[in-house]
Regions:
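Structured loop/turn residues at beta-strand edges in well-structured enzyme cores
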Residues: 49, 73-74, 95, 114
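Beta-strand-turn-beta hairpins that frame and shape the catalytic cleft
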Residues: 1-2, 14-20, 108-114
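Conserved G/P- and acidic residue-centered "switch" motifs that form tight phosphate/ATP-binding loops
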Residues: 58
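Bacterial Sec-exported substrate-binding components of ABC uptake systems
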Residues: 1-9
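Metal-dependent catalytic neighborhoods of phosphoester/phosphodiester hydrolases
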Residues: 65-75, 90-93
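Pre-active-site segment of Zn-dependent metallo-hydrolases
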Residues: 16-55, 66-71
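Metallo-beta-lactamase
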Residues: 80-114
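A short helix->loop->beta-strand "cap" motif at the edges of active sites that frequently abuts
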Residues: 18, 74-77, 97-98
Length: 114
């Protein structure tokens, strides 16, 4: 397994089963140009934009960064926590992704052999 810190809370986790991108804020600013990466982020690579899974921990803009989400390959499976409201799920679908898989607190999921 290899973990790469992209910036802020964004991680890229590579396993034998595939790649997971966590909280993709890959470039630019968020919160109306008031927050920026430090150190400054670099332009995302093509490889970075093609994860197998994307895990969004919650709906704050520095974790669910719309400009970054728009650049990601739509074949990625989106994973979100089950909160009991459909806001994150609806917004993921509005960006052109399939309905996300909701994760239940304390339960394991199988993402393949890795």
């Amino acid at each position: 397994m290899r973990v790469t810190v992209i910036g802020h809370s964004c991680l890229r986790v590579e396993t034998r089963a595939g790649t997971i991108l966590v909280d993709p804020w890959l470039f630019g600013s968020c919160y109306w140009r008031s927050w920026w990466h430090f150190p400054p982020s670099t332009e995302p690579t093509e490889e970075m934009l093609r994860p197998d899974w994307v895990y969004l921990t919650h709906h704050h803009f520095d974790h669910f960064h719309y400009p970054s989400m728009r650049k990601l390959d739509r074949s990625a499976e989106i994973l979100i926590p089950r909160f009991g409201v459909d806001v994150m799920s609806d917004e993921v679908e509005s960006l052109g992704f399939e309905k996300p898989r909701e994760l239940i607190h304390g339960r394991e999921i199988d993402l393949g052999d890795g």
